[in-house]
Amino acid sequence: MLLYLDLSPVLHYFSTLRSMDGLSAAASVTAIIDISAKVASLCFQYSVAVKDAKKDIDRLQKIVTDIKNVLEEVKRLLLLDGQNKPRLSTTHKLSDSLEQCHQQLDELKTQLEPRKTRKVMQRLGVRALKWPFTSKQVEKMVASLEKYGQTFGLALQVDQT
């Protein structure tokens, strides 16, 4: 069973990220962590039901999980005491990347979520699940998401030195 969360209130924070404090930065990072977890969960459901796209699904699930893990560490550092705030100056400048990553993951989640017709079919006992992407589309998504993961990881490394 999936839990769906309306992230629109969190998007308000994206407009103020350029001058964000630790709590607002953590809220923005939390939004991406939440949506990453949902996308990874949806990918897992597809990997169980759709055998012919397993490799693509696993690749997409791995990169989304990697982004989630990096951002969980960023969030942990952002929520530390005020003594660490000056050290996180690079992380505080990630507003554009955070917003773009959130948008891409939100679009991905929308494409992976069950449609009304699928829900009706499930009620009738028919379990039809079709992977909505070609291998080429997955390759593009993975490449794009890898860039975000690298950006967030590098910012984290700079702030920890």
Residue ranges of predicted features:
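Acidic/serine-rich, low-complexity amphipathic helices located in mid- to C-terminal regulatory regions
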Residues: Q100, Q104, V138-Q157
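N-terminal amphipathic alpha-helical segments
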Residues: D6, V10-K93, L108, L112, ...
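Short, well-structured alpha-helical interface segments that form or flank functional binding sites
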Residues: K62, D96, K140
